[in-house]
Regions:
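Fe-S-dependent hydro-lyases/dehydratases of central metabolism
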Residues: 1-219
Length: 219
């Protein structure tokens, strides 16, 4: 662990790993965003087939997000004049992300937009900290959208954080052209937005880790 922390690398499969199935997707063939329609995570749809759907609430959070997604949402929200037409929930996946986003001024942007900030963690994904309004139509970045999971009778689309942010601003699922205009804006700032975060980059978290007392349970 100490060696990995000194030189962290993303995990990768062994060269001789065996798989039940290999599915190859040419990303050049993907011309528009893909969502999962209510209320089945296996019901994948192209954005163009569901565009225009009115959206009541948006959740950006869960373990599917990282700090870059919240920066991207913040950049888009910062350009909005006045309030947004949806109820927006934001829940960074870790306290570390929340700390850094606060330091970078994003929490002020979220507050100005009227977003509801949840404690870092699962939040709406499991419906165990709060729930969306009954029978609302929602865009969520979570991993599952089973019936009644996020709220009673809620219709939940699963989408990327960037698409979710756009939906929160427009109050609907955007057209492909509308989304691409926002995406172009995000892409122009990608180098600043999509910087991954590790706790060893923050002094407070590094100190806490160094002084952590981990009990050892002996059989």
């Amino acid at each position: 662990m100490e060696a990995w922390l000194a030189k962290p690398e993303l995990l990768s499969a062994d060269a001789d790993a065996e798989y039940a199935e290999i599915i190859e997707i040419d990303l050049a063939d993907v011309k528009e965003p893909v969502l999962c329609a209510p209320n089945d995570p296996d019901d994948a749809r192209l954005l163009s087939s569901v565009q225009g759907e009115k959206i009541d609430e948006v959740f950006i959070g869960s373990c599917m997000t990282n700090i870059g997604h919240f920066r991207a949402a913040g950049k888009l929200l910062d350009k909005v004049k006045g309030g947004i037409p949806t109820r927006l929930w934001l829940s960074p996946p870790t306290k570390m992300d929340a700390h850094q986003l606060t330091e970078e001024g994003y929490y002020g942007i979220y507050g100005k937009a009227g977003a509801r900030m949840e404690m870092p963690g699962c939040s709406l994904c499991m419906g165990n900290q709060a729930r969306v309004a009954a029978n609302s139509t929602v865009v969520s970045t979570s991993t599952r959208n089973f019936p009644n999971r996020l709220g009673d009778g809620a219709n939940v689309y699963l989408a990327s954080a960037e698409l979710a942010a756009v939906a929160s601003i427009l109050g609907k699922l955007p057209t492909v052209e509308e989304y691409m205009a926002y995406a172009k804006d995000i892409d122009s700032m990608a180098g600043d937005i999509y910087r991954y975060l590790s706790f060893d980059q923050i002094a407070d978290f590094r100190e806490a880790a160094a002084n952590a007392k981990i009990p050892v349970v002996q059989a």
